[in-house]
Amino acid sequence: MNEFPKNDENDESDESDEDTAKDRVVVVTGAGTGIGRETARAFAAEGARVLAVGRRPEPLAETAGAYPSLIEPLAADITGPEAPEAVVAAALERFGQLDVLINNAGIVRSGQGVGGYDRTGIEALLATNLVAPVLLGQAALPALGDSRGVIVNVSTAVGQRGWPSNAVYAASKAALETVTRSWAVELAPRGIRVAAVAPGAIDTPIGDHSGYGPEQRAAVRKWQIEHTPLGRTGRPEEVAWAITQLASPRASFVTGVVLSVDGGALVG
């Protein structure tokens, strides 16, 4: 029978700094609230230096307030034509390197079923959920190649199973997952890992800006919980934990994976 080798009695079980985010530089988009905020704080808790990117200065300042010596806010619209290069330049100027890119920023719009779409709405969804992560990742490649870094994209459970009445949102995330898998192969020779998380129903403010009214949001949340085997919504910090694990040096043989963080919704 095969047995795992026993640890030397002098081995220390605690994580070394090489196994954590200590002294690494992380860029997190959509860091003003929800998953992005908790991800920025989770990396800072491990000793990483974090550039927290978002559109609104006030929420970013609140994010940074938890670890003011480690999290620096940067107010920027990542869909702007010069934003990807500007974000990377800011990280390099402030910290001198870039090790991890978390493409978390995303938007959702109220139900736009067949016949209800317009060009402006489609382009807005794709600009934030797909085009910006691709261009930001592309801008970060030289720095990530130098550090043999990591890209973690934030998708969604409906990117894998579709969302009736919100097909374009689901499609934008499905496309991001395809980019994740494709880049994992393409960038492996450069030592860059690429992975994604696919959250299910998470208790975040993203729905507040979706155009859904309170009753619609409550109905959607009720449906989500009913279709989640664990019977509840997830917490932003639960997704943040998964993101930090994928970005960890301990996950050095993990690339191309899309990790579901959905309480079992995809398989249930």
Stretches with model-predicted labels:
Residues 32-34:
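Conserved glycine-rich cofactor-binding loop
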Residues 142, 185-189, 252:
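Alpha-helical segment proximal to the catalytic Tyr-Lys
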